[in-house]
């Protein structure tokens, strides 16, 4: 939400975060999104609950909910795949189709968006949530991210109809290029890659 974060947690240590605290019974994602959109400043909101998963279920009921899947893809040289979509560095991902499993969607989307063939689908890295407005409607998108590998260093073909203008392989020591122009959720996903150097 405009680089802001809503943290649903199970503990109640208000000193842990420099944040605004929200009663978990009164989280209205639409209203919160409008407030953040008007303010334009990145903010952190925290809601503490003994049942954060139940709080998430309640939030999902009030907005359009989309499932997506994507990948953090590594080639045989140890370089990672990044795409530039709408002027920002990102990872390939896309919407899960009806009757499609998350893992299947992740592989399909990466292959479609970058014109390559995934050799191995690894473990789920994590799930992220992203809120945005589409056609005047507030959308909550959950994305499952998976580790993936390809043979060799295949050429990349960015899917331009998905607003992807570049697809590149980057070694870990060049990830500062991505960090300077990406989203906070992508920063979280690639945070552990520095240990590979």
Where are these regions (language model features)?
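Conserved beta-strand and immediately adjacent loop positions that scaffold enzyme active sites
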Residues: 70, 79, 166
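Acidic, metal-coordinating catalytic segment for phosphate/diphosphate chemistry
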Residues: 26-70
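Short connector loops at helix/strand junctions that flank enzyme active sites
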Residues: 64-69, 86, 141-143
């Amino acid at each position: 939400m405009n680089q802001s974060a809503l943290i649903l947690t199970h503990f109640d240590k208000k000193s842990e975060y420099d944040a605004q605290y929200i009663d978990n019974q009164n989280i209205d994602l639409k209203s919160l999104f409008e407030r953040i959109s008007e303010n334009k400043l990145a903010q952190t909101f925290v809601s503490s609950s003994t049942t954060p998963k139940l709080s998430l279920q309640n939030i999902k009921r009030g907005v359009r909910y989309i499932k997506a899947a994507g990948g953090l893809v590594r080639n045989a040289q140890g370089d990672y795949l990044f795409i530039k979509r709408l002027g920002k560095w990102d990872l390939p991902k896309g919407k899960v189709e009806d009757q499609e499993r998350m893992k299947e969607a992740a592989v399909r989307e990466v292959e479609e968006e970058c014109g390559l063939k995934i050799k191995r689908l690894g473990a789920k890295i994590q799930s992220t949530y992203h809120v945005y407005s589409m056609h005047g409607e507030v959308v909550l998108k959950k994305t499952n991210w998976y580790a993936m590998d390809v043979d060799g260093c295949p050429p990349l073909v960015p899917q331009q109809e998905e607003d992807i203008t570049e697809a590149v392989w980057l070694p870990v020591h060049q990830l500062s290029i991505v960090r300077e122009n990406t989203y906070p959720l992508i920063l979280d996903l690639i945070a552990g890659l520095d240990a590979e150097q």
